[in-house]
């Protein structure tokens, strides 16, 4: 039986894990919901093309900023001393000036089939790797005990012949 080096098995496991992670990706959604208290919530803050999630203190903007946001309402981030617009559903942009029509469609059959196939392949590679490791471990363990047995019965150095 031809055996594969452990590096190949590890590389295949890493590739399978990466493919699985790419297919089943997750998105972090900020928890600043209009129904929640606006005093303290978690908001998505983007600075220099580096999105981060940070805990910030949020208050309403002063009354002179009423017309600042075109389709939404103004909020003031106290910790950062900056104002932002919380846009109404369907609008985006710094001042909620762009209409953004989102269309949600169910997953296509091809995407579901690809996901199932990749998960199945990942499970096969994982099971194969575990099988390979168990056989390798058993062979190594039996070789050690066989060598120990041969050393004792052959009358190695310093041992009387049996």
UniProtKB/Swiss-Prot annotation:
Coiled coil: none
GO MF annotation list: epidermal growth factor receptor binding; growth factor activity; receptor ligand activity; transmembrane receptor protein tyrosine kinase activator activity
Official protein name in the record: Proepiregulin
Induction section of the entry: By angiotensin II, endothelin-1 and alpha-thrombin. Strongly induced in ovarian granulosa cells by FSH stimulation.
One biological process term in Gene Ontology: positive regulation of angiogenesis
Biological role: Ligand of the EGF receptor/EGFR and ERBB4. Stimulates EGFR and ERBB4 tyrosine phosphorylation. Contributes to inflammation, wound healing, tissue repair, and oocyte maturation by regulating angiogenesis and vascular remodeling and by stimulating cell proliferation.
Subunit record text: Interacts with EGFR and ERBB4.
GO cellular component term of the entry, any: plasma membrane
Organism encoding this protein: Rattus norvegicus
Cleaved signal peptide residues: 1-22
Domain spans labelled EGF-like: 57-97
Sugar-bearing residue positions: 40
UniProt entry keywords in alphabetical sequence: Angiogenesis, Cell membrane, Developmental protein, Differentiation, Disulfide bond, EGF-like domain, Glycoprotein, Growth factor, Membrane, Mitogen, Secreted, Signal, Transmembrane, Transmembrane helix
Transmembrane segments: 113-133
Annotated PANTHER family: PROEPIREGULIN, TRANSFORMING GROWTH FACTOR ALPHA
Gene this protein is translated from: Ereg
Propeptide: 23-55, 102-162
InterPro entries: EGF-like_dom
Disulfide bonds listed in the record: 61-74, 69-85, 87-96
């Amino acid at each position: 039986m031809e055996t594969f080096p452990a590096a190949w098995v590890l590389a295949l496991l890493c590739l399978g894990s990466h493919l699985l992670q790419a297919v089943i990706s997750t998105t972090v959604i900020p928890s600043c919901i209009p129904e929640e208290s606006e005093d303290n919530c978690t908001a998505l803050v983007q600075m220099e093309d580096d999105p981060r999630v940070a805990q910030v203190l949020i208050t309403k903007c002063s009354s002179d900023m009423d017309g600042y946001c075109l389709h939404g309402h103004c909020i003031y981030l106290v910790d950062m001393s900056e104002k932002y617009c919380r846009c109404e559903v369907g609008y985006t942009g710094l001042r909620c000036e762009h209409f953004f029509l989102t269309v949600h469609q169910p997953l296509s059959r091809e995407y579901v089939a690809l996901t199932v196939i990749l998960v199945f392949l990942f499970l096969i590679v994982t099971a194969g790797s575990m099988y390979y490791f168990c056989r390798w471990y058993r062979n190594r363990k039996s070789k050690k005990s066989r060598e120990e047995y041969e050393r004792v019965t052959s009358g190695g150095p310093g041992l009387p012949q049996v």
